Amino acid sequence: GDPVAPSVLLFPPSKEELTTGTATIVCVANKFYPSDITVTWKVDGTTQQSGIENSKTPQSPEDNTYSLSSTLSLTSAQYNSHSVYTCEVVQGSASPIVQSFNRGDC
């Protein structure tokens, strides 16, 4: 089948979670094909290497697409010491799909 680009959503940590000392940021890429996809996390422009967990769903029997959720886990202190959080999703040779948020806007 033809490649299908994902729709990408980025979810900041909840205020409730931050009070517990942890900050979980979730980037979701929905309905893409083929399954070859790369997620890159950046914090204030710096690529993150640790604290990342990816989970991909099996191929959907309805439309043969895949979905992926990528979670970046930080402490509240780490989270509060930075501003811009970015999730970049790259599929094959397509240009990256970028979602980001500014902590101050949340």
Swiss-Prot record:
Q: Which residue ranges does the record assign to the Ig-like domain?
A: 6-99
Which cysteines pair up through disulfides? They are 27-87
List, alphabetically, the PROSITE patterns matched: IG_LIKE
Database matches in Pfam families: C1-set
Q: Where are the transmembrane segments?
A: none
Which residue intervals are annotated with compositional bias (Polar residues) in the record? 48-64
Question: Which Gene3D superfamilies does the entry link to?
Answer: Immunoglobulins
Domain of life here? Eukaryota
Q: Is Membrane found in the keyword set?
A: no
Entry keywords, A to Z: Disulfide bond, Immunoglobulin domain
Give the span(s) annotated as Disordered.
48-67
In the UniProt entry for this protein, what further remark is given in the free-text comments? In Basilea rabbits, the major type of light chain is lambda. The kappa chain shown is a minor component. All other rabbit B allotypes have 'Cys-64'. In rabbits two Ig kappa light chain genes are present, C kappa 1 and C kappa 2 or K-BAS.
Name recorded for this polypeptide: Ig kappa-b4 chain C region
Gene this protein is translated from: K-BAS
